[in-house]
Amino acid sequence: MTDIFTQLDGVEFSARAIDIDTGYEVFSHQPDRVLSTASIAKIFLLHAALRMREAGELRLEERLTRTAAERVHESGLWYLLDQPDFTVHDIGMLIGAFSDNYATNVLISRIGLDRVAEEVAALGYTDSALHDFLRWPRPAGAPARLSSGTASELSDYMARLSLDELFDSSTSEIMRRWLGAGADTSMVASYFEPDPLAHYYYTRGEWIVNKTGTDDTVRADTGIAFTRQRRVAYAVFANWEAGTDRVLEVMPLMRAAGGLISDHLHA
């Protein structure tokens, strides 16, 4: 089952997929290897926001106003919009749907990286983290990467989210809805061929909720895939050397991982 993750010299994978209800391991390859995960750890920022909501420290209706210092382009929509403020709920949706960098920075300013780190530690995770704001160019002394993590910890998070172990059921649904709006279905999720812009429902009997991360040397995808009978939590991360372009080789393997998950869902 791990053969697909050993096919490319110079590419490191961390991968794991488990049946949420039985614990059966669908596949596993270096699940505890720590890799750069690009935007994946924005999940922990959203998690911290919901934990603060539970503690009465944050309301989803609270409006946050962006500043010029938080502005960053590339992924997302907010930098293209005139609207200067959004509710925390809508900022979460921008992050979940489009991995919005501007929205991420605004929410980090409200919550704080230290609080995110505390919530990650409370989850019991030691190898996964959101390290910094989105910045470009990255200044001297800033963390070298936005986030890092292991397939073991992120697949565990997704399993716990599916089981409503992280929050009460209504709060879990907020998180799942944020992530379920994700428009990037190009990696593991591509095997299921969902409509990238609207797939919070069963498509050909399968449902996918996921978050991705993309950088010059990173492709990462973690999520939940399920039918009416089975549920699988997964994480597949790939890193390669700077100055090389391995995307066209890596992406078919990410899709193949989705095929292994689908095979289990329908076994």
Predicted regions and their residues:
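A short glycine/serine-rich beta->alpha loop
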Residues: 28-35, 77, 81, 141-144
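Short glycine/serine- and small hydrophobic-enriched flexible loop segments
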Residues: 47-55, 109, 156-163, 262-263
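Conserved catalytic neighborhood of penicillin-recognizing serine enzymes
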Residues: 71-105
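Mid-domain, small-residue-enriched loop/turn segments at the edges of structured enzyme/sensor domains
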Residues: 10-13, 108-163
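Structured C-terminal helix/loop/strand segments within mature extracytoplasmic catalytic/sensor domains
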Residues: 1-5, 9, 26, 164-186, ...
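Active-site SXXK
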Residues: 23, 36-64, 234
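Short, glycine/proline-biased beta-turn/loop segments that scaffold the active-site neighborhood
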Residues: 55-81
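Short, conserved catalytic-motif segment at the N-terminal edge
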Residues: 11-34
